[in-house]
Amino acid sequence: TQIQRIASTGYYDEKAVSCVLRALAVTDPKSVEDIYNPEYLTVGFKQIIDSLGKTDLAKGADTIVVTKMALKLITLAHSVERNQRIYQRLSDEIDALSKAVTTEHSDFLNDELCVSSINTQNNFHLFGSLYQSIISPNFAKLLIYGDERFLRDTDNQERIRALLLAGIRAVILWRQ
């Protein structure tokens, strides 16, 4: 949902994005709530209901695009998991990035979501670069549809890549 929102409007839900971006840095959780605060996932929960709970006739074009993207992301995450070399490298890089980000922003992992520490362009750049260096060259590209003005913007590209990485991690965690 947030990827499509950025691609179409250039905007995003700051709390929802910070929740999933923060989740990339939680590498030793004791529960699901340590990773994702359900309070900030309302938009995502609504999207699941819209994507899977309605008949095809009741779904809007945006819902169909988001559903297709989610299915492609699930397939991509599965491909990453099957490639042990890439999977291990990604895991190691996420661990290293988690340490770097939490050193720079001591409140990054706090239970109370600190949006200003998480949603920095530098963090989007770090996580987006990780996606670009490990996932992009080794797997099929995911096509993101939206407004060309927003898709050309480098900051938006980094946000989208960071969110794709967060989506891959979410799928892998869900399977575990």
Where does each model-flagged region fall?
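Beta-strand-enriched cores of mature, soluble protein domains
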Residues: E14-V26, N138-L143, E148, L173
